[in-house]
Curated annotation (Swiss-Prot):
Biological process, per Gene Ontology: translation
NCBIfam families on file: rplO_bact (TIGR01071)
Assembly description: Part of the 50S ribosomal subunit.
Listed GO MF terms: rRNA binding; structural constituent of ribosome
HAMAP family: Ribosomal_uL15 (MF_01341)
Ranges annotated as biased composition (Basic residues): 11-21, 30-47
Pfam family, one: Ribosomal_L27A
Stated name of the protein: Large ribosomal subunit protein uL15
Spans annotated as Disordered: 1-52
Gene: rplO
Function, as annotated: Binds to the 23S rRNA.
Domain of life the protein comes from: Bacteria
């Protein structure tokens, strides 16, 4: 058996109807388009959602869905456990960027509580949640 000798099974391939080839073909004269009207003409399609000039459904209904705000691209929340990776005890935005915990676009950082933390750190110019603040102060850290 070779690829060039393989042929489809009998009656598995039907030849397509040739339109506009006489009355006897069943698709002659108007070629299955009916008589007159926009859809019988060449290029006579209407765009998706078009309702004949009536206000379409997608414009009658209100908009919905959630669009991510631009602010979210510049904000980040960091768990306290992330600071265990940093050797510095003084932490601010520059130190976080240097240690690749946040990317260069981030401008606002909030520190949130997590259990795996036991280090004295000094935080400057970062937002801190209530529980994270308690935890930092418990281990002798400060927040400016």
């Amino acid at each position: 058996m070779y690829l060039n000798t393989i042929s489809p099974m009998k009656k598995s391939n039907h030849s397509s109807k040739r339109k506009g080839r006489g009355i006897g073909s069943g698709k002659g004269k108007t070629s299955g388009r009916g008589h007159k009207g926009q859809r019988s003409r060449s290029g006579g399609k209407v765009r998706r959602g078009f309702e004949g000039g009536q206000m379409p459904l997608y414009r009658r209904l209100p908009k919905f869905g959630h669009n991510k705000s631009k602010k979210s691209f510049f904000k980040k929340e960091i768990k306290l456990s992330e600071f265990m990776k940093i050797k510095d005890s003084f932490i601010d935005l520059i130190v976080l960027k240097k240690n690749k915990i946040i990317n260069s676009k981030i401008k606002i950082v909030k520190i949130i509580f997590s259990k795996n933390f036991n280090k004295k750190i000094n935080i400057k110019n970062l937002k801190v949640s209530k529980n994270a603040k308690k935890e930092i102060e418990f281990f002798g850290g400060t927040i400016n």
